[in-house]
Amino acid sequence: MSEVIKSVPPGSQNTSQWIISKDQLVFTPSALDGIPLDQEEIQRSKGCNFIINVGLRLKLPQTALATANIYFHRFYLRFSLKNYHYYEVAATCIFLATKVEDSVRKLRDIVINCAKVAQKNSNVLVDEQTKEYWRWRDVILYTEEVLLEALCFDFTVEHPYPYVLSFIKKFVADDKNVTKVAWTYINDSTRSIACLLYSPKTIAAAAFQFALEKNEINLSTTTDGLPVWMEESQVSYEDVKGVLTLIDSLYKKINPSKQALPIDQKNGSHASSVAPGTPSSLASVSTQATPQHQNSSGRTDSFHSLNTETPSKSTVDDQILSTAAQPKKSSDTDKEMETEAS
């Protein structure tokens, strides 16, 4: 059993018990199966993209989407990507998260939407009369047992959102633009392994710092040039910098050709051109998403923001989720999963 698996005690109700060190990343089950760390991160991100796209079709609240993503990352602390395809685990995480977060959806609806997203075709027929329906249904019910084991029946998830709202209220008087950018940044962070390396409070602090500089807001600093608000909030400067660097790295791996998009101050959405958004005092970070509210539904062109309704075939998510937009037979989908997992 790997060092990482040992580091997560059964039944832990403490978020910190799910946090590992960077050194332990080389001992994940996937790494021990020969999957390079950068490829593991990309496959994790693909699974999170799948969660978001299916979740938006189901009109799930934001907390349910975030919880599903965290379950997904925790699952692969105990099991390998080589043995469990990220689409299948992602679908199961959605199913469990909807129950835990009191956002229950019918298994039938989850199955149908998972099949449609996996095949990249909203019009494909999936119902109880198709093999694809029963294949996905069986996969979700089977994998749920494995997921429960992986989580040690510890369903409690602490999110960064309350922390960032506290920072915003205390230090910038509930500035709406800061809130939008910080909220979106946290959403994007769920696609990375940040939740495995840093506490929710640290992730929230990174989102707040990024939002401050994105909106050109300068708060007071110490004689050493460090933000006073971090000191008052008892947040580590180095850890915040680590989160920013990690998210930046993920953006570059997923879509190296694109950088941060500027916020359109008129409507709060991102423009289509490239613009810098680097927190100069900390690290270079790219972000590409639109701030959202908890009960919105939709999707943007790269990372998840909940402000549109239907997926676009020209998006980065589309490139990640599938290699074809035509309907596939069940056997074709199985073959695609086997190819992606290898």
Swiss-Prot record:
Residues 261-342 are annotated as: Disordered. Its main location: nucleus. It comes from the Eukaryota. Residues 278-314 have a biased composition (Polar residues). GO terms for cellular component: cyclin-dependent protein kinase holoenzyme complex; cyclin/CDK positive transcription elongation factor complex; cytosol; nucleus; P-TEFb complex. One of its GO terms (biological process) is signaling. Signal peptide: none annotated. Keywords: Cell cycle, Cell division, Cyclin, Nucleus, Phosphoprotein. It holds the Pfam family Cyclin_C. Interacts with cdc2 protein kinase and with the N-terminal domain of cdk9. Essential for progression through the whole cell cycle. This is Cyclin pch1. It comes from Schizosaccharomyces pombe (strain 972 / ATCC 24843) (Fission yeast).
